[in-house]
Amino acid sequence: MESRHILITGASSGIGLEAAQQLAAAGHRLTLPCRSQARADALGELLAKRQLQDQVSRPLGDLADLASVEQLAATLLEQGMPIDTLVLNAGLQYSGASEPRWSAQGFELTLAVNHLAHQALLQRLLPLLLASPQPRVVVTASEVHDPSTPGGRVGQPAGVGNLEGLRQGPGAAMVDGQTPFNAEKAYKDSKLCNLLMARALAASLAEQQHKMPVLTWSPGLVIPRGSGGFFRYSREHNPLGQTLFTLLARDLLRVSETPARAGALLAELAAGPVAQETGFSYRSNRLVGPGQLRFETREPSAEASNDALAEQLWQLSASLVGLQADQGLNHH
């Protein structure tokens, strides 16, 4: 396996951190944006302890602020090193909160970090991906995007309506512009947006005859033992509920994946062999029995498979983050 230059968002904790360590140990060159200097320093210390710091850069890039995303991309473009794999993995959830939180530009924070910042970064970095001989994009989604799955059925289902919230712009609490704020639905919607964005990207790349696989995946329910990772925001809001949920899911029912195993799946998607050399694909780590998960190619939800909706989302999101819809795509 030859060495790749891999950029991973959300690599300072959880699955992203696990994947980063495994990829660094395998000899890949990594760029791991961190939202603060404190985060970057902590990540540097952790990697140094494991002798993994040599091939890793940790630039500042706060996904909750589009100006910071723009600065990060500008720095990387200036350095000019091709990106072989772009992993859009950061995923914020603040379950249990009754009020929305807002990004620096006034967008609801879950959507801002999980979707808008990722599209902004992706479009700006496309020239560096297209400069790689074998580029790929990997997007971490979630089964909760699909109302027919066990996780997607709990609470309000994902659904972006006609994207009225994006048409309203900053200050809209939900993407559909209709439903009252619900933190869990906001997360599900953001994961649906991840899949729609990936689908729109794959369609545009095909139109421009660029060969680049767009690999989307769902890690399954990953529950770490400790305070880091995906559940850290939810734990602050509902500590007892989270503790009971964790005990049930991880220790009694064994329906959850370990961060190390989920990290290995992500590392494989980022640097392993690809089944197809271009186009959209979706794989899900699905529960087939207690303690047994199977990682397999699946179809995302009907809504996530709507090409017209994907194209609309791409165009609206591009304009919200201050880009032309074809920015980065018309690069030869």
Put a short name on every predicted segment:
Residues 78-80, 97-98, 124-133, 204-207:
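A short helix-coil junction within the Rossmann-fold of NAD(P)-dependent oxidoreductases
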Residues 93-98, 146:
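Helix N-cap/beta-alpha junction loops of NAD(P)-dependent oxidoreductase domains
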Residues 90, 138-141, 173:
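Active-site beta-alpha turn of Rossmann-fold NAD(P)-dependent dehydrogenases/reductases
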Residues 96-112:
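Short alpha-helical oligomerization interface
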Residues 122-123, 199:
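A short, exposed helix-loop element centered on a Lys and neighboring polar residues
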Residues 82, 129-166, 209-213:
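Active-site loop of short-chain dehydrogenase/reductase
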Residues 1-84, 91-93, 152, 174-332:
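NAD(P)H-dependent oxidoreductase Rossmann-fold/reductase module
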